[in-house]
């Protein structure tokens, strides 16, 4: 196996930062609605749709352009590195969010790409920790769909 364990984490963090910037500075404006009483709010349905579109874009770009040449085994180990990082830093930011607010915001920027899963889980009424576990674990393994099958060597 090539030393490719870092590819999924680096790609996903870079894509997350880009997604976060796009949501905050450009695309988030699409979700703003004026309510009948004149107040301004964010439409959660539009936000979930926006997050889903960005997620699909990240998955397709990563799968077709960055991970297509990797085997499923390589993608699995690389994705597992990201999952471990998500779990450790996710719990750390949860426990220290009042103390290390700037780190919490930084980690949010670097883990934004899979946020659609936690948004859907909240929409379905799942508990906070279950939705966090889904968002931390499931998205990186979607790249397995784009990997090559392992060719056994004799």
Language-model segments: which ranges?
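Transmembrane alpha-helical insertion/packing segments
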Residues: 1-52
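Cytosolic juxtamembrane helix at the C-terminal end of the final transmembrane segment
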Residues: 3-4, 67-70, 131-154
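Hydrophobic alpha-helical membrane-insertion segments
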Residues: 11-22, 77-101
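Transmembrane helix-loop junctions in multipass membrane proteins, especially transporters and channels
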Residues: 28, 32-36, 67-71, 94-106, ...
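Canonical alpha-helical transmembrane segments
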Residues: 47-74
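Hydrophobic alpha-helical transmembrane segments
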Residues: 48-56, 116-141
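Cytoplasmic juxtamembrane regions at transmembrane-helix boundaries
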Residues: 69-89, 147-154
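Membrane-interfacial helical/loop segments at transmembrane boundaries in membrane proteins
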Residues: 102-123
């Amino acid at each position: 196996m090539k030393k490719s364990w870092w590819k999924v984490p680096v790609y996903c963090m870079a894509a997350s930062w880009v997604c976060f910037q796009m949501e905050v500075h450009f695309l988030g404006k699409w979700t703003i609605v004026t309510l009948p009483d004149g107040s301004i709010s964010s439409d959660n349905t539009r936000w979930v749709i926006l997050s889903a579109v960005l997620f699909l874009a990240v998955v397709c770009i990563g799968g077709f352009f960055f991970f297509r040449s990797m085997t499923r085994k390589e993608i699995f180990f690389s994705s597992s590195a990201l999952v471990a990082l998500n779990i450790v830093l996710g719990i750390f930011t949860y426990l220290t969010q009042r103390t290390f607010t700037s780190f919490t915001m930084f980690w949010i920027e670097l883990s934004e790409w899979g946020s659609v899963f936690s948004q859907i889980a909240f929409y379905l009424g799942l508990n906070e920790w279950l939705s966090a576990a889904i968002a931390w674990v499931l998205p990186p393994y979607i790249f397995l769909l784009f990997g090559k099958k392992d060719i056994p060597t004799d």
